[in-house]
Amino acid sequence: MAKRDYYEVLGISKSASADEIKKAYRKLSKQYHPDINKEAGADEKFKEISEAYEALSDPQKRAQYDQYGHVDPNQGFGGGAGGGFGGGGFSGFEDIFDTFFGGGGRQQDPNAPRQGSDLQYTMRLKFKEAIFGKDAEIEIPREENCDTCHGSGAKPGTTPEKCSHCGGKGSINVEQNTPFGRVVNKRTCQYCNGTGKEIKEKCPTCHGKGRVTKTKKIKVKVPAGVNDGQQMRVSGEGEAGINGGPNGDLYVVFVVIPDEFFEREADDIYVEVPITFVQATLGDEIDVPTVHGKVRLKIPSGTQTGTTFRLRGKGVPHLRGNGTGDQHVIVKVIVPKKLDDKQKEILREFASTTGDKVDEQTSGFFDKMKRAFKGD
C-alpha cells in the first residue's frame, strides 16, 4: 500500500511554516492519540501523523522529502562502506574510472575491523515524564557476535579458510566491454560475499553468519527537559562490530504524548484558565495547576479575556544548563448564558448606573468598527 503524502497527512500546504507544521501535528496527535481515541485505526493514524511530523519538522529531512518523496535517495546508488556511487546502476562507470585512474586503492580489506551498525529506538513519554525525566529500561533486538564461534562463523575447533575464488581479497576481476574499450572491473566475490573467507564447516548456532539476533535490556536515563522529536545517543549499544571493530551506537528518539490541559513551547508552558464575569470584574484569587503543583494566582479587577499572566520558574527545566522556563496563564472570561429574572434585573441596574459606557480604549475599537461598517 502506497504511503500518503506527508503534507496531506497533516492537512497543510507544501509552503507551510515550521510553526504551522507544529500546530497541525499537535492538533491531530491530540485527536488520534491511542490513549485518548479508542476508535479502530486511531493507533495507525497516530503513527502516520508522527512519521509525517518527524520528516517535515526537520529542515534537512523535509528538503530531502520535497525532492525525493518517499523514495530513499540512496537506493540504487550504493550506500555501502565505499559511499558515493559504489553500487547500483552507476557502478560500471565507477569501475571504469577506477581502472583508468587508479581507483583500485579504494578497495577495503574485507578482514579490516568495521564499526557495527547504529540502531534507533522510539520511546514514548508522557508529558510530565519529558519535563522531569525518568529512568527506563528498554528492550532492543540487535545483532551480536555468536557466543559459540565468537563471530568467526566456523564450527568450534575449525577456522575459516581463505576464499579459493578471490584469494581472500573479497573481490574478483571481471572483464567488461565499455565505450573506452575492454576493461577489467572489480566485483564483490559472490562466493564469500566480500568477506574473503570460506567456511567449510559452519557453526551450528549461527549457521556460518558469525552473528545472532538477541534481545538486549538497556537502562536509559531520560534527562529532564527533553522535547518531542529530540534524540539521545547511547554510545556502544548498537550492533556488534565486524572483525573486532567497535559496536555501533543506539539513538533513542523521544515522542511526547500531548497533554489535554498543558501545552509546551520550547521551555515554556501555556494553559488557558476560565474565570467568571464577576471574577474578571471584581478581581479574585484562583488556584492554577502547574506541572510543579498548584499555584495561587491573583486576578486584578477589570481583567479582560485573553490577558496573560506569567508564573516564573513554573515551566520546563532547561535541558542544557541551569534554570527553568515559565508558565503562561491565559484567562478566558466566561459570560453566563442563562440568567434568572433577578440576575437580569441586577445587570440592568448595573448598566443604568454606568450609563452603559465603555472605556476609551474600547470606545476607540467601536469607532473603528463603525467606520468599517460605513466603508470609511
Curated annotation (Swiss-Prot):
One of its GO terms (molecular function) is ATP binding. SUPFAM superfamilies: Chaperone J-domain, DnaJ/Hsp40 cysteine-rich domain, HSP40/DnaJ peptide-binding domain. Its cofactor is Zn(2+). The keyword Zinc-finger applies. Zn(2+) 2 binds at C163, C166, C189, C192. Zn(2+) 1 binds at C146, C149, C203, C206. This is Chaperone protein DnaJ. It comes from Listeria monocytogenes serotype 4a (strain HCC23).
